[in-house]
């Protein structure tokens, strides 16, 4: 198993931005594994049943992946923030696809907190702690509730990944 994404040429940026990317529906197309309930919510049991190596490796990259690569090469600090419970298979896929990152923040095992509350809580320190407070931040996600939650933290730019990707599909 490959344990780290192959490195590419990367600019040493003295004033990097913090670029935060969701995975599913943002950088990765995992829609073939999704089933929704009648009310539109995610069928989590179906999702977990389809988190096998065979199913995960059928996922594909979305156009926003290239923005992530560009941000990484420009020396920005790349954070992957996902509501997935990350597994070894997920990491293997991320590394095999060349998805560059400096930090991954994911759902703790067994945590059932709604996505936008979880992500806001997990990312809050980038807005509150002194070393990060005055650094420019960008947040990319396809979920409107997540965008609103992160936007409520204050200064930063949020991008609707669904709209972004649809421009290029």
Where are these regions (language model features)?
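Alpha-helical substrate-recognition element adjacent to the catalytic core
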Residues: 2-113
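Short, charged, surface-exposed secondary-structure boundary motifs
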Residues: 112-117, 167-169
